[in-house]
């Protein structure tokens, strides 16, 4: 049975994704002091506990980025407060180092993503990279993705990220990424796996397809990206302690950059597909249409540039041009027909 202190902590967090992250950081504190369990933390004298948290902050200042430390402490505050332990949090926050300008804000270029894909030697890894590149999802979304969250829409796919969670949002896959995902699922079926709506979208490596499928973890995806980047030679330039492009987030940044620079893209829809809330939107946009159809119509505008393969992108652009030509020809034919009818009417009069 779970200890009551942990049950209170978990029940006080609404978002499943946040719960996982907070628990991870609570465990870091517990392991740092080699504490037996969660309830034993609460048995420590308040003054001693205050010193422990302060020392923990000062230790992290010698090891971690200044921007990381608050994210390690806020979960502790949530745990202690919901268990009625009062610490001097203002004093603790005064120990935080000054934040620094974040490095690693650059996005992967399309050419770099091509290199990454060339170093993905199995269908799963290729599908994961294209999934992130075309949907903009965080690496932390993968453990929660089920097949029921992914549905065909035209020649693309609709994806529900963090479904049934307060952070739920809709994004999409390009035709290129959709095909890679379908190829990966087909491989799993051929290996003997029975797929249903509750099957993980991406499963851990397996020897036999019949084995019970377990979702990939965030660590699995991150370590895969680390290996691929090392093999591709793309992890060389550092800014201080960080690389210019974040390992996983560089794909999400690429999505964000492309979709917001797309001609005639509605920014508020772009933010929704990126999983951002929009508290500062103008009043007249608070009633904007965020239906799947509306979001997909905006997403389609960005498909050519989100597509990684050059020949696929050129094919999409050519198809779009041919569609415009066909529409123009139909319009011209209608005008010609209308003019012909008018001439016939004039002659009859």
Question: Model-found features: residue ranges?
Answer:
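Flexible interdomain linker/hinge and immediately adjacent N-terminus
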Residues: 50-54, 85-115, 162, 205-213
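Short, basic (Lys/Arg/His-rich) helix/loop patches that form interaction surfaces
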Residues: 222-272, 276-280
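Catalytic-site neighborhood detector that most strongly recognizes the C-terminal catalytic loop/helix
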Residues: 107, 165, 261, 273-322
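Active-site/catalytic core of tyrosine-dependent DNA strand-transfer enzymes
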Residues: 175-242
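Basic, Lys/Arg- and aromatic-enriched nucleic-acid-binding interface segment
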Residues: 110-139, 252
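Short, charged phosphate-coordinating catalytic segments
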Residues: 132-155, 267-272
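Conserved tyrosine-mediated DNA breakage-rejoining catalytic core shared by Y-recombinases
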Residues: 144-190, 197
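Non-catalytic DNA-binding core/recognition domains of DNA-processing enzymes
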Residues: 11-86, 173
């Amino acid at each position: 049975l779970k200890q009551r202190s942990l049950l209170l902590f978990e029940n006080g967090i609404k978002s499943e994704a946040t719960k996982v992250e907070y628990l991870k950081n609570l465990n870091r504190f517990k392991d740092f002091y080699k504490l037996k369990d969660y309830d034993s933390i609460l048995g420590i004298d308040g003054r001693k506990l205050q010193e422990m948290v302060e020392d923990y902050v000062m230790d992290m200042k010698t090891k971690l980025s200044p921007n990381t430390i608050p994210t390690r402490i806020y979960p502790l505050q949530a745990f202690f407060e919901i268990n009625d332990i009062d610490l001097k949090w203002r004093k603790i926050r005064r120990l935080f180092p000054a934040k620094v300008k974040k490095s690693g804000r650059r996005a992967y270029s399309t050419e770099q993503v091509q290199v990454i894909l060339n170093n993905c030697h199995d269908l799963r890894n290729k599908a994961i990279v294209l999934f992130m590149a075309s949907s903009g999802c965080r690496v932390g979304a993968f453990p929660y993705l089920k097949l029921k969250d992914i549905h065909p829409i035209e020649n693309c796919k609709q994806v529900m990220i963090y479904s049934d969670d307060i952070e739920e949002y809709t994004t999409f896959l390009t035709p290129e990424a959709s095909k890679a995902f379908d190829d990966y699922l087909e491989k799993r079926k051929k290996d003997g796996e029975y797929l249903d709506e509750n099957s993980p979208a991406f499963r851990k490596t397996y020897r036999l397809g019949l084995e019970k499928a377990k979702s990939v973890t965030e660590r699995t995806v991150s370590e895969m990206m680390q290996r691929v980047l090392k093999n591709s030679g793309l992890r060389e330039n550092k800014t201080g302690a960080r690389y210019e492009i974040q390992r996983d987030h560089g794909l999400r940044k690429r999505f964000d950059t492309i979709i917001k620079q797309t001609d005639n893209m509605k920014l508020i829809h772009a933010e929704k597909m990126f999983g951002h809330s929009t508290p500062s939107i103008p009043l007249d946009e608070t009633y904007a249409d965020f239906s799947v159809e509306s979001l997909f119509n905006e997403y389609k505008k960005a498909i050519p540039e989100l597509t990684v393969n050059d020949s696929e992108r050129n094919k999409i652009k050519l198809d779009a041009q041919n569609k415009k030509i066909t529409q123009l020809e139909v319009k011209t034919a209608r005008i010609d027909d209308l003019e012909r009818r008018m001439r016939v009417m004039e002659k009859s009069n």
